[in-house]
């Protein structure tokens, strides 16, 4: 019994130490649990915030585009501008936004975009000219977007016209290098006589029709080709023939000759008893029977 009483203080101390270790372990585990929970919360919060920011940035991708227009003196031209918003899945029009048309730096017309994002702006020129113009979002617009530009061709309907397939101007569609002498020879044809239409086949990978129009315009400018009216068409074999009929029906009946590279382009003219020149010389058997063939652009004028 005396031994027990002697050991009691030691036993009590041991239990106190054991209890302290237990309490410390419990507190440490609870503390770590809280820290991990908070870390997880902040991680989730960070991911959600980043996703929201990226989503907002994506929603803010807005484009304003426009393409060339064609009219005659004292006749109103309808210029179509399109305001779109590109999301992760689709591109949609933005309606209810004011759009301004600028000619020579001055606001010439205003219009609101419809539900499809299109705004129709009217402009009338009194004289024959090739008029560069710009469209932009109006001062009261809720969006911030870069300006877009194109050309308005104002031509007399009695003036001779020619159509040129863009592919006939390039050595290689991939490299985008111009055919030798093409710019100089086309410049001679258009300086005093022809008004020129450039016909471009729409490549969906290159963007919308308006974007392809802008790319073609910039390439022609960079390569010093004469300014003309640009038409963007689908790659279907009947696309140019249908457009040719539309132009004739609209009064542009002086369009009687085309210079192109593809068989489909040449046939569209020949089927309507019009003239077609193919350049460069196609492979044997590829040229339609009545098509004229030029080996290079220096020979084109001789065939017209």
What are these regions (language model features)?
Residues 57-157:
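Beta-strand-enriched, solvent-exposed domains that form extended recognition/catalytic surfaces
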Residues 42-51:
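Bacterial N-terminal signal peptides
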Residues 13-28:
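Hydrophobic alpha-helical signal peptides and transmembrane signal-/tail-anchor segments
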Residues 50-58:
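Bacterial Sec-dependent signal peptides at the C-terminal "C-region" and cleavage site
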Residues 7, 11, 31-42:
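Bacterial N-terminal signal peptides that target proteins for export
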Residues 62-63, 86, 114-119, 146-241:
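Alpha-helical substrate-recognition element adjacent to the catalytic core
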């Amino acid at each position: 019994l005396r031994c027990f009483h002697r050991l009691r203080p030691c036993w009590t101390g041991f239990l106190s130490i054991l209890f302290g270790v237990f309490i410390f372990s419990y507190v440490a585990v609870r503390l770590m649990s809280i820290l991990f929970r908070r870390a997880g919360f902040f991680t989730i919060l960070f991911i959600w915030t980043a996703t929201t920011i990226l989503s907002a940035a994506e929603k803010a991708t807005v484009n304003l585009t426009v393409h060339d227009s064609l009219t005659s003196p004292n006749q109103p031209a309808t210029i179509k501008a399109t305001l779109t918003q590109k999301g992760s899945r689709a591109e949609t029009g933005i309606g209810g936004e004011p759009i301004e048309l600028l000619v020579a730096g001055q606001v010439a017309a205003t219009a609101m975009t419809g539900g499809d994002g299109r705004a129709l702006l009217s402009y009338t020129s009194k004289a024959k000219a090739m008029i560069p113009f710009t469209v932009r979002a109006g001062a009261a617009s809720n969006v911030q977007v870069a300006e877009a530009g194109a050309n308005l061709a104002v031509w007399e309907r009695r003036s001779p016209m020619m159509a040129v397939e863009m592919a006939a101007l390039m050595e290689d569609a991939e490299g985008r290098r111009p055919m030798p002498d093409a710019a100089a020879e086309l410049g001679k044809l258009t300086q005093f006589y022809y008004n020129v239409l450039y016909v471009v086949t729409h490549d969906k990978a290159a963007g919308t029709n308006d974007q392809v129009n802008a790319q073609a315009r910039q390439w022609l400018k960079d390569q010093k080709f004469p300014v003309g009216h640009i038409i963007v068409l689908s790659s279907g074999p009947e696309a140019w023939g249908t457009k040719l009929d539309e132009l004739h029906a609209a009064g542009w009946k002086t369009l009687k000759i085309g210079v192109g590279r593809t068989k489909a382009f040449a046939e569209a003219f020949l089927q309507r008893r019009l003239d077609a020149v193919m350049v460069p010389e196609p492979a044997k058997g590829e040229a339609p029977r009545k098509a004229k063939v030029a080996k290079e652009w220096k020979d084109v004028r001789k065939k017209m």
